[in-house]
Amino acid sequence: MKYNRNIKGNELRKIDGKFESRYMHDAEVVLEELNKVSPSFCLAKWFNVSIHIPTGKTHSCYHPKSHLIPKTELEDDNSALHNTKHKKEQRGMMLNGIRPPECEFCWQTEDSGSQLSDRAYRSKDVYEPGLIEEAKQLGMDGNARPRYVEVNFNQACNFKCSYCSPH
């Protein structure tokens, strides 16, 4: 796979004789690798986490609703901040080529055939060589160490998230 981790942002590069978005190109390359595992595989379920402190909820992507981090799971293993049973079930579905219903936004985007879904972009954001293999080895039961961590300390939206604001 031709991938350059040192390229940041959305640079225009000459690719195959024409100028294209390097970010989009790299996301397409990562998507090809994801699809070798399954057509529903997404690295975000393993390696992205948003933790909402005031509500005790978590999610790996901003499209699905966040879900409660069960206190009993957290008492047994503090990695349940990210590795909840719910997320592990979703990972199992993805490994088996089943589309988790909570990821409907991406499935609708992909089914439209008009553009890449956030499955490609969120996976590309954390991608590094060997990460797909690591996720496969962890399977649905392993405890993944996130590469992207977002902690929300209050519920107020100030439109300053990276996906709402360029600042």
PLM-predicted stretches and their roles:
Residues 24-25, 36, 135-138, 161:
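Short charge-dense sequence patches
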Residues 7-9, 155:
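Low-complexity, compositionally biased segments
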Residues 3-5, 12, 17-124:
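Accessory C-terminal segments flanking Radical SAM cores
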Residues 60-68, 105, 110, 143-167:
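Canonical Radical SAM [4Fe-4S] cluster-binding loop centered on the CxxxCxxC motif
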Residues 43, 90, 140, 148-151:
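A general structural-boundary detector
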Residues 111-147, 159:
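Recognition helices and adjacent regulatory flanks at domain boundaries
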